[in-house]
Amino acid sequence: MKDLNAFIYCRVSDNHKAYLLDYQEKMLTECSKQLGINAVAVSKEVDDGKHFWSRGIQCLEHYIINHKVDLILIYDQTRLFIFDDLNDEFKLLCDKNNVTILTSGDLQILTLME
């Protein structure tokens, strides 16, 4: 996994849980370092996860479309969007641009295999 560039995306749904953004970032950053993955950008936002218009998702799309990342690291699939159809549409964008989405669970398995 070395020499791969990743975008770390963290999201919570309301300000009362904003402290969990730091936890998500720390966990994903530690796993990426263990695997030799280069984190080139981090987005932490409070958003409901119901649309593509958030600042963090727009920034993430920019990195994907401009081929600046190979991986997107997220805590779990619901951190991107809460609706399956939006997650599926986002995955299409990633597939088209050869970007892989990895959750914290995926990363933990990969670190065990190293």
Predicted regions and their residues:
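Short, structured surface patches at the beginning of a domain
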Residues: M1-E114
